[in-house]
Amino acid sequence: MFRPEEIIETIKMIKMENLDLRTVTLGLSLRDCVSKDLDELKENIYNKITSSAENLVETAERISEKYGIPIVNKRIAVTPISLVIGGAIKDLDKEEQIKACVEVGEVLDKAAKKVRVDFLGGYSALVHKDATKEDRALIDSIPFMMEKTERVCSSVNVASTKTGINMDAVKRMGEIIKETAFRTEKAIGCAKLVVFANAPEDNPFMAGAFHGVGEGDKVINVGVSGPGVVRAVIEKLPDADFGTLANEIKKVAFKITRVGELIGREVSKELGVKFGVVDLSLAPTPARGDSIANILEAMGLEKCGTHGSTAALALLNDAVKKGGAMATSYVGGLSGAFIPVSEDSGMVEAVEAGALTLEKLEAMTCVCSVGIDMVAIPGDTPASTISAIIADEMAIGVINNKTTAVRIIPVPGKKAGEYVDYGGLLGKAPIMEVNKYSSEKFIKRGGRIPAPLQALTN
Protein backbone atom coordinates (compact mmCIF):
# COMPACT_ATOMS: atom_id res chain seq x y z
CA MET A 1 0.00 0.00 0.00
CA PHE A 2 1.15 3.54 -0.76
CA ARG A 3 1.05 6.02 2.10
CA PRO A 4 -0.98 9.26 1.49
CA GLU A 5 2.19 11.37 1.67
CA GLU A 6 3.78 9.26 -1.10
CA ILE A 7 0.77 9.88 -3.35
CA ILE A 8 0.90 13.63 -2.63
CA GLU A 9 4.66 13.60 -3.32
CA THR A 10 4.10 11.97 -6.73
CA ILE A 11 1.39 14.50 -7.64
CA LYS A 12 3.78 17.32 -6.67
CA MET A 13 6.54 15.79 -8.82
CA ILE A 14 4.25 15.79 -11.86
CA LYS A 15 2.42 19.10 -11.39
CA MET A 16 5.21 21.30 -10.02
CA GLU A 17 8.55 19.64 -10.83
CA ASN A 18 7.98 18.51 -14.45
CA LEU A 19 8.21 14.76 -13.82
CA ASP A 20 7.27 12.87 -16.96
CA LEU A 21 8.12 9.81 -18.95
CA ARG A 22 10.16 11.15 -21.84
CA THR A 23 9.51 8.28 -24.19
CA VAL A 24 7.87 4.91 -24.71
CA THR A 25 9.77 3.36 -27.61
CA LEU A 26 8.71 0.26 -29.53
CA GLY A 27 11.70 -1.66 -30.88
CA LEU A 28 10.98 -3.59 -34.09
CA SER A 29 13.09 -6.10 -35.97
CA LEU A 30 12.97 -5.65 -39.75
CA ARG A 31 15.07 -8.72 -40.50
CA ASP A 32 12.00 -10.61 -41.71
CA CYS A 33 11.38 -7.81 -44.24
CA VAL A 34 14.53 -8.49 -46.27
CA SER A 35 14.03 -8.88 -50.03
CA LYS A 36 16.11 -8.69 -53.21
CA ASP A 37 13.36 -6.56 -54.74
CA LEU A 38 13.39 -2.94 -53.55
CA ASP A 39 9.63 -2.42 -53.92
CA GLU A 40 8.91 -5.60 -51.97
CA LEU A 41 11.37 -4.54 -49.25
CA LYS A 42 9.64 -1.17 -48.91
CA GLU A 43 6.21 -2.79 -48.77
CA ASN A 44 7.38 -5.31 -46.15
CA ILE A 45 8.86 -2.55 -43.97
CA TYR A 46 5.73 -0.38 -44.20
CA ASN A 47 3.42 -3.28 -43.38
CA LYS A 48 5.56 -4.49 -40.46
CA ILE A 49 5.70 -1.04 -38.84
CA THR A 50 2.06 -0.09 -39.38
CA SER A 51 0.70 -3.44 -38.18
CA SER A 52 3.02 -3.71 -35.16
CA ALA A 53 2.63 -0.11 -33.98
CA GLU A 54 -0.99 0.64 -34.91
CA ASN A 55 -2.07 0.74 -31.24
CA LEU A 56 1.14 2.14 -29.69
CA VAL A 57 0.13 5.80 -29.41
CA GLU A 58 -3.45 5.08 -28.34
CA THR A 59 -2.29 2.59 -25.67
CA ALA A 60 0.41 4.91 -24.30
CA GLU A 61 -2.06 7.80 -24.09
CA ARG A 62 -4.65 5.67 -22.32
CA ILE A 63 -2.16 4.45 -19.71
CA SER A 64 -0.78 7.97 -19.30
CA GLU A 65 -4.30 9.16 -18.50
CA LYS A 66 -4.96 6.20 -16.19
CA TYR A 67 -1.94 6.95 -13.98
CA GLY A 68 -1.75 10.70 -14.52
CA ILE A 69 1.87 10.44 -15.71
CA PRO A 70 2.62 12.48 -18.88
CA ILE A 71 4.31 10.52 -21.68
CA VAL A 72 5.99 13.17 -23.82
CA ASN A 73 6.93 11.08 -26.88
CA LYS A 74 5.89 7.82 -28.47
CA ARG A 75 8.62 6.46 -30.75
CA ILE A 76 9.75 3.49 -32.82
CA ALA A 77 13.25 2.06 -33.24
CA VAL A 78 13.98 -0.37 -36.08
CA THR A 79 16.82 -2.64 -37.17
CA PRO A 80 19.66 -0.56 -38.69
CA ILE A 81 18.57 -0.07 -42.29
CA SER A 82 22.05 -0.83 -43.65
CA LEU A 83 21.57 -4.41 -42.37
CA VAL A 84 18.34 -5.03 -44.31
CA ILE A 85 18.85 -3.10 -47.55
CA GLY A 86 21.93 -4.91 -48.95
CA GLY A 87 20.17 -7.49 -51.12
CA ALA A 88 17.91 -4.89 -52.74
CA ILE A 89 20.72 -2.54 -53.81
CA LYS A 90 23.71 -4.80 -54.51
CA ASP A 91 23.33 -4.69 -58.32
CA LEU A 92 22.72 -0.92 -58.53
CA ASP A 93 25.30 1.75 -59.28
CA LYS A 94 26.28 4.17 -56.51
CA GLU A 95 23.82 6.91 -57.44
CA GLU A 96 20.93 4.44 -57.65
CA GLN A 97 21.94 2.89 -54.31
CA ILE A 98 21.72 6.29 -52.62
CA LYS A 99 18.34 6.93 -54.26
CA ALA A 100 17.08 3.52 -53.07
CA CYS A 101 18.18 4.23 -49.50
CA VAL A 102 16.32 7.56 -49.57
CA GLU A 103 13.18 5.77 -50.81
CA VAL A 104 13.38 3.43 -47.82
CA GLY A 105 13.77 6.47 -45.56
CA GLU A 106 10.62 7.97 -47.08
CA VAL A 107 8.75 4.73 -46.39
CA LEU A 108 9.88 4.88 -42.74
CA ASP A 109 8.61 8.46 -42.54
CA LYS A 110 5.28 7.53 -44.12
CA ALA A 111 4.85 4.63 -41.67
CA ALA A 112 5.76 6.85 -38.69
CA LYS A 113 3.10 9.37 -39.71
CA LYS A 114 0.53 6.63 -40.26
CA VAL A 115 0.90 5.29 -36.69
CA ARG A 116 1.30 8.87 -35.29
CA VAL A 117 4.64 8.39 -33.52
CA ASP A 118 6.82 11.44 -32.90
CA PHE A 119 10.05 9.93 -34.24
CA LEU A 120 11.35 6.76 -35.82
CA GLY A 121 15.01 5.81 -35.33
CA GLY A 122 17.13 3.24 -37.11
CA TYR A 123 18.24 4.85 -40.36
CA SER A 124 21.59 3.64 -39.12
CA ALA A 125 24.90 1.99 -39.94
CA LEU A 126 27.38 0.20 -37.67
CA VAL A 127 30.84 0.92 -39.07
CA HIS A 128 33.08 0.90 -35.99
CA LYS A 129 35.66 -1.30 -37.74
CA ASP A 130 34.94 -0.94 -41.44
CA ALA A 131 32.05 -0.30 -43.82
CA THR A 132 30.29 -2.49 -46.38
CA LYS A 133 28.98 -1.19 -49.70
CA GLU A 134 25.48 -0.79 -48.26
CA ASP A 135 26.85 0.97 -45.14
CA ARG A 136 28.58 3.52 -47.36
CA ALA A 137 25.48 3.99 -49.53
CA LEU A 138 23.29 4.60 -46.50
CA ILE A 139 25.75 7.08 -44.96
CA ASP A 140 26.05 8.96 -48.26
CA SER A 141 22.24 9.12 -48.50
CA ILE A 142 21.67 10.72 -45.07
CA PRO A 143 21.58 14.39 -46.23
CA PHE A 144 19.13 13.56 -49.04
CA MET A 145 16.96 11.43 -46.73
CA MET A 146 16.83 14.23 -44.13
CA GLU A 147 15.78 16.66 -46.86
CA LYS A 148 12.75 14.52 -47.73
CA THR A 149 11.57 13.28 -44.31
CA GLU A 150 10.31 14.79 -41.05
CA ARG A 151 10.30 12.08 -38.38
CA VAL A 152 13.17 9.76 -39.29
CA CYS A 153 16.32 9.83 -37.15
CA SER A 154 19.74 8.58 -38.17
CA SER A 155 22.74 7.29 -36.25
CA VAL A 156 26.15 5.95 -37.21
CA ASN A 157 28.39 3.99 -34.83
CA VAL A 158 32.00 4.79 -35.82
CA ALA A 159 33.95 3.50 -32.80
CA SER A 160 33.97 0.92 -30.02
CA THR A 161 36.27 -0.09 -27.19
CA LYS A 162 36.78 -3.51 -28.81
CA THR A 163 37.65 -2.21 -32.29
CA GLY A 164 39.02 1.31 -31.89
CA ILE A 165 37.98 4.32 -33.99
CA ASN A 166 37.20 4.08 -37.71
CA MET A 167 38.74 7.40 -38.75
CA ASP A 168 37.61 7.02 -42.37
CA ALA A 169 34.02 6.98 -41.07
CA VAL A 170 34.76 9.89 -38.72
CA LYS A 171 36.08 11.93 -41.65
CA ARG A 172 33.04 11.10 -43.77
CA MET A 173 30.58 11.96 -40.99
CA GLY A 174 32.04 15.47 -40.69
CA GLU A 175 31.27 15.94 -44.39
CA ILE A 176 27.80 14.37 -44.06
CA ILE A 177 26.88 16.67 -41.17
CA LYS A 178 27.93 19.73 -43.21
CA GLU A 179 25.90 18.58 -46.20
CA THR A 180 22.87 17.76 -44.04
CA ALA A 181 23.01 21.27 -42.55
CA PHE A 182 23.06 22.76 -46.04
CA ARG A 183 20.15 20.66 -47.33
CA THR A 184 17.69 21.11 -44.43
CA GLU A 185 15.97 24.24 -43.11
CA LYS A 186 17.93 25.84 -40.24
CA ALA A 187 20.13 22.70 -40.36
CA ILE A 188 17.32 20.80 -38.58
CA GLY A 189 18.48 17.53 -40.15
CA CYS A 190 21.58 17.63 -37.95
CA ALA A 191 19.35 17.56 -34.85
CA LYS A 192 18.16 14.13 -36.03
CA LEU A 193 21.65 12.75 -36.75
CA VAL A 194 24.05 11.38 -34.15
CA VAL A 195 27.52 9.81 -34.34
CA PHE A 196 28.29 7.15 -31.71
CA ALA A 197 31.02 5.23 -29.95
CA ASN A 198 29.79 2.06 -28.20
CA ALA A 199 26.17 2.60 -29.29
CA PRO A 200 23.69 0.61 -27.15
CA GLU A 201 21.22 -1.72 -28.87
CA ASP A 202 18.26 -0.88 -26.62
CA ASN A 203 18.36 2.92 -26.45
CA PRO A 204 14.84 4.44 -26.35
CA PHE A 205 16.08 8.02 -26.87
CA MET A 206 16.40 9.87 -30.18
CA ALA A 207 18.24 10.51 -32.35
CA GLY A 208 20.33 7.43 -31.54
CA ALA A 209 17.69 4.73 -31.12
CA PHE A 210 17.89 1.56 -33.20
CA HIS A 211 16.77 -2.03 -32.60
CA GLY A 212 19.93 -4.07 -32.11
CA VAL A 213 20.75 -7.43 -33.67
CA GLY A 214 20.69 -9.11 -30.24
CA GLU A 215 17.08 -8.05 -29.66
CA GLY A 216 13.93 -10.07 -30.29
CA ASP A 217 11.14 -9.31 -32.74
CA LYS A 218 9.41 -6.59 -30.67
CA VAL A 219 10.18 -4.88 -27.36
CA ILE A 220 9.08 -1.86 -25.32
CA ASN A 221 11.85 0.31 -23.84
CA VAL A 222 11.15 3.43 -21.79
CA GLY A 223 13.15 6.55 -21.01
CA VAL A 224 12.51 8.54 -17.85
CA SER A 225 12.95 12.25 -17.25
CA GLY A 226 12.81 14.35 -14.10
CA PRO A 227 15.66 16.87 -13.62
CA GLY A 228 13.19 19.23 -11.93
CA VAL A 229 12.42 16.63 -9.27
CA VAL A 230 16.12 16.12 -8.49
CA ARG A 231 16.75 19.88 -8.37
CA ALA A 232 13.87 20.36 -5.91
CA VAL A 233 15.40 17.77 -3.56
CA ILE A 234 18.84 19.41 -3.68
CA GLU A 235 17.42 22.88 -3.04
CA LYS A 236 15.99 21.58 0.25
CA LEU A 237 19.54 20.64 1.38
CA PRO A 238 21.59 23.85 1.05
CA ASP A 239 24.14 22.86 3.72
CA ALA A 240 24.25 19.06 3.36
CA ASP A 241 27.57 17.32 2.66
CA PHE A 242 28.10 15.34 -0.56
CA GLY A 243 27.36 11.96 1.02
CA THR A 244 23.94 13.18 2.16
CA LEU A 245 23.34 14.81 -1.23
CA ALA A 246 24.17 11.59 -3.10
CA ASN A 247 21.88 9.60 -0.83
CA GLU A 248 18.91 11.92 -1.40
CA ILE A 249 19.46 11.88 -5.19
CA LYS A 250 19.51 8.07 -5.05
CA LYS A 251 16.16 8.04 -3.26
CA VAL A 252 14.45 10.31 -5.77
CA ALA A 253 16.01 8.44 -8.73
CA PHE A 254 14.52 5.26 -7.29
CA LYS A 255 11.05 6.84 -7.29
CA ILE A 256 11.41 8.24 -10.83
CA THR A 257 12.58 4.87 -12.18
CA ARG A 258 9.79 2.99 -10.43
CA VAL A 259 7.28 5.18 -12.27
CA GLY A 260 9.05 4.48 -15.57
CA GLU A 261 9.01 0.73 -15.12
CA LEU A 262 5.35 0.72 -14.05
CA ILE A 263 4.25 2.57 -17.20
CA GLY A 264 6.56 0.55 -19.46
CA ARG A 265 5.28 -2.78 -18.18
CA GLU A 266 1.65 -1.64 -18.50
CA VAL A 267 2.17 -0.55 -22.11
CA SER A 268 3.99 -3.76 -23.02
CA LYS A 269 1.28 -5.89 -21.36
CA GLU A 270 -1.50 -4.07 -23.27
CA LEU A 271 0.34 -4.43 -26.58
CA GLY A 272 1.33 -8.05 -25.96
CA VAL A 273 5.00 -7.16 -26.40
CA LYS A 274 7.94 -8.02 -24.13
CA PHE A 275 9.18 -5.33 -21.75
CA GLY A 276 12.84 -4.47 -22.35
CA VAL A 277 14.61 -1.84 -20.24
CA VAL A 278 14.27 1.41 -18.39
CA ASP A 279 16.83 3.99 -19.52
CA LEU A 280 17.78 5.89 -16.37
CA SER A 281 18.90 9.03 -18.20
CA LEU A 282 17.82 12.35 -16.72
CA ALA A 283 16.58 14.13 -19.85
CA PRO A 284 16.09 17.91 -19.62
CA THR A 285 13.65 20.05 -21.59
CA PRO A 286 13.69 23.77 -22.44
CA ALA A 287 11.01 24.29 -19.73
CA ARG A 288 12.13 26.52 -16.86
CA GLY A 289 13.43 24.38 -13.96
CA ASP A 290 13.62 21.16 -15.99
CA SER A 291 17.37 21.49 -16.37
CA ILE A 292 20.53 19.48 -15.61
CA ALA A 293 22.51 22.74 -15.41
CA ASN A 294 20.14 23.99 -12.69
CA ILE A 295 20.81 20.82 -10.66
CA LEU A 296 24.56 21.51 -10.72
CA GLU A 297 23.93 25.13 -9.74
CA ALA A 298 21.69 23.99 -6.87
CA MET A 299 24.70 22.05 -5.56
CA GLY A 300 26.54 25.35 -5.14
CA LEU A 301 28.03 26.31 -8.50
CA GLU A 302 27.40 29.92 -9.53
CA LYS A 303 27.04 28.85 -13.18
CA CYS A 304 27.17 25.50 -14.91
CA GLY A 305 30.52 25.25 -16.69
CA THR A 306 32.61 26.79 -13.93
CA HIS A 307 35.28 24.74 -12.14
CA GLY A 308 33.64 21.94 -10.19
CA SER A 309 30.99 21.27 -12.84
CA THR A 310 32.52 17.94 -13.88
CA ALA A 311 32.69 16.74 -10.26
CA ALA A 312 29.10 17.81 -9.59
CA LEU A 313 27.91 16.03 -12.73
CA ALA A 314 29.83 12.87 -11.78
CA LEU A 315 28.11 12.81 -8.38
CA LEU A 316 24.70 13.32 -9.99
CA ASN A 317 25.23 10.66 -12.65
CA ASP A 318 26.48 8.04 -10.20
CA ALA A 319 23.70 8.65 -7.66
CA VAL A 320 21.01 8.44 -10.37
CA LYS A 321 22.41 5.10 -11.58
CA LYS A 322 22.55 3.65 -8.06
CA GLY A 323 19.00 4.72 -7.23
CA GLY A 324 17.64 3.61 -10.58
CA ALA A 325 19.34 0.22 -10.48
CA MET A 326 17.66 -0.44 -7.12
CA ALA A 327 14.24 0.27 -8.66
CA THR A 328 14.53 -2.04 -11.67
CA SER A 329 16.64 -5.05 -12.64
CA TYR A 330 16.33 -4.16 -16.31
CA VAL A 331 18.47 -1.08 -16.82
CA GLY A 332 19.66 -0.28 -20.33
CA GLY A 333 20.06 2.28 -23.07
CA LEU A 334 22.28 5.24 -22.20
CA SER A 335 21.40 5.54 -18.48
CA GLY A 336 23.09 8.71 -17.28
CA ALA A 337 22.52 12.45 -17.25
CA PHE A 338 22.05 14.16 -20.64
CA ILE A 339 23.67 17.54 -21.15
CA PRO A 340 22.21 18.80 -24.45
CA VAL A 341 22.72 22.54 -24.85
CA SER A 342 19.64 23.70 -26.76
CA GLU A 343 17.26 21.38 -24.88
CA ASP A 344 18.31 22.70 -21.45
CA SER A 345 17.48 26.32 -20.54
CA GLY A 346 20.18 26.34 -17.84
CA MET A 347 22.82 25.22 -20.33
CA VAL A 348 21.77 27.96 -22.74
CA GLU A 349 22.12 30.56 -19.97
CA ALA A 350 25.56 29.18 -19.05
CA VAL A 351 26.73 29.54 -22.67
CA GLU A 352 25.30 33.07 -22.85
CA ALA A 353 27.16 34.03 -19.65
CA GLY A 354 30.45 32.69 -21.04
CA ALA A 355 30.65 30.08 -18.28
CA LEU A 356 30.26 27.04 -20.55
CA THR A 357 32.54 26.49 -23.55
CA LEU A 358 32.71 23.63 -26.02
CA GLU A 359 35.93 22.44 -24.37
CA LYS A 360 34.36 22.34 -20.89
CA LEU A 361 31.32 20.57 -22.29
CA GLU A 362 33.63 17.91 -23.72
CA ALA A 363 35.26 17.44 -20.30
CA MET A 364 31.84 17.01 -18.69
CA THR A 365 30.94 14.25 -21.16
CA CYS A 366 33.65 12.07 -19.60
CA VAL A 367 31.41 11.45 -16.58
CA CYS A 368 27.88 11.28 -18.00
CA SER A 369 25.88 10.30 -21.04
CA VAL A 370 25.90 10.91 -23.78
CA GLY A 371 28.23 13.52 -25.30
CA ILE A 372 28.42 16.74 -27.30
CA ASP A 373 24.67 17.06 -27.77
CA MET A 374 22.51 19.65 -29.57
CA VAL A 375 25.43 22.03 -29.90
CA ALA A 376 25.05 24.68 -32.63
CA ILE A 377 28.26 25.99 -34.20
CA PRO A 378 29.03 28.54 -36.95
CA GLY A 379 27.94 27.45 -40.41
CA ASP A 380 31.38 28.09 -41.90
CA THR A 381 33.07 25.54 -39.59
CA PRO A 382 35.15 23.21 -41.82
CA ALA A 383 34.04 19.57 -42.12
CA SER A 384 37.49 18.52 -40.87
CA THR A 385 36.93 20.46 -37.62
CA ILE A 386 33.58 18.73 -37.11
CA SER A 387 35.30 15.38 -37.75
CA ALA A 388 37.97 16.29 -35.19
CA ILE A 389 35.30 17.15 -32.58
CA ILE A 390 33.75 13.73 -33.30
CA ALA A 391 37.17 12.03 -33.00
CA ASP A 392 37.80 13.60 -29.58
CA GLU A 393 34.42 12.46 -28.28
CA MET A 394 34.88 8.96 -29.73
CA ALA A 395 38.26 8.72 -27.96
CA ILE A 396 36.59 9.50 -24.61
CA GLY A 397 34.09 6.69 -25.21
CA VAL A 398 36.59 4.14 -26.45
CA ILE A 399 39.17 4.67 -23.69
CA ASN A 400 36.60 4.83 -20.88
CA ASN A 401 34.52 1.93 -22.24
CA LYS A 402 31.33 4.01 -22.29
CA THR A 403 28.84 5.33 -24.81
CA THR A 404 29.65 8.76 -26.18
CA ALA A 405 28.10 10.62 -29.08
CA VAL A 406 28.08 13.84 -31.07
CA ARG A 407 24.96 15.65 -32.28
CA ILE A 408 26.32 18.91 -33.63
CA ILE A 409 24.66 21.52 -35.84
CA PRO A 410 26.69 23.80 -38.14
CA VAL A 411 24.01 26.40 -38.93
CA PRO A 412 24.51 28.02 -42.38
CA GLY A 413 24.88 31.80 -42.20
CA LYS A 414 25.17 31.90 -38.40
CA LYS A 415 28.15 33.12 -36.38
CA ALA A 416 29.18 32.64 -32.73
CA GLY A 417 26.87 34.56 -30.39
CA GLU A 418 23.81 34.29 -32.65
CA TYR A 419 20.91 31.86 -32.18
CA VAL A 420 18.89 29.21 -33.95
CA ASP A 421 15.42 28.44 -32.58
CA TYR A 422 13.76 25.06 -33.25
CA GLY A 423 10.94 25.30 -30.70
CA GLY A 424 9.44 22.34 -28.85
CA LEU A 425 11.77 19.83 -27.20
CA LEU A 426 14.74 20.87 -29.36
CA GLY A 427 14.67 24.41 -27.96
CA LYS A 428 16.81 27.43 -28.80
CA ALA A 429 20.55 27.02 -29.40
CA PRO A 430 23.20 29.72 -29.00
CA ILE A 431 25.91 29.39 -31.66
CA MET A 432 29.05 28.29 -29.79
CA GLU A 433 32.57 29.23 -30.76
CA VAL A 434 34.91 26.52 -32.07
CA ASN A 435 38.70 26.47 -32.06
CA LYS A 436 39.94 28.43 -35.08
CA TYR A 437 43.02 26.23 -35.66
CA SER A 438 42.87 23.50 -38.31
CA SER A 439 42.73 19.73 -37.75
CA GLU A 440 42.58 18.93 -41.47
CA LYS A 441 45.96 17.19 -41.84
CA PHE A 442 45.20 14.99 -38.83
CA ILE A 443 41.79 13.95 -40.15
CA LYS A 444 43.16 13.29 -43.67
CA ARG A 445 45.40 10.48 -42.37
CA GLY A 446 42.44 8.08 -42.34
CA GLY A 447 42.64 4.44 -41.32
CA ARG A 448 41.72 3.12 -37.90
CA ILE A 449 42.94 4.16 -34.47
CA PRO A 450 43.63 0.77 -32.81
CA ALA A 451 41.57 -0.53 -29.91
CA PRO A 452 43.03 0.34 -26.50
CA LEU A 453 44.49 -2.11 -23.99
CA GLN A 454 41.12 -1.99 -22.21
CA ALA A 455 39.75 -4.10 -25.09
CA LEU A 456 41.86 -7.11 -24.06
CA THR A 457 39.55 -8.46 -21.38
CA ASN A 458 39.37 -12.17 -22.31
UniProtKB/Swiss-Prot annotation:
Transmembrane segments: none annotated. SUPFAM superfamilies: PFL-like glycyl radical enzymes. NCBIfam families: PRK05313.1. It comes from Methanocaldococcus jannaschii (strain ATCC 43067 / DSM 2661 / JAL-1 / JCM 10045 / NBRC 100440). This is UPF0210 protein MJ1665. Belongs to the UPF0210 family. CDD domains: RNR_PFL_like_DUF711. Pfam families: DUF711 (PF05167). InterPro entries: UPF0210.
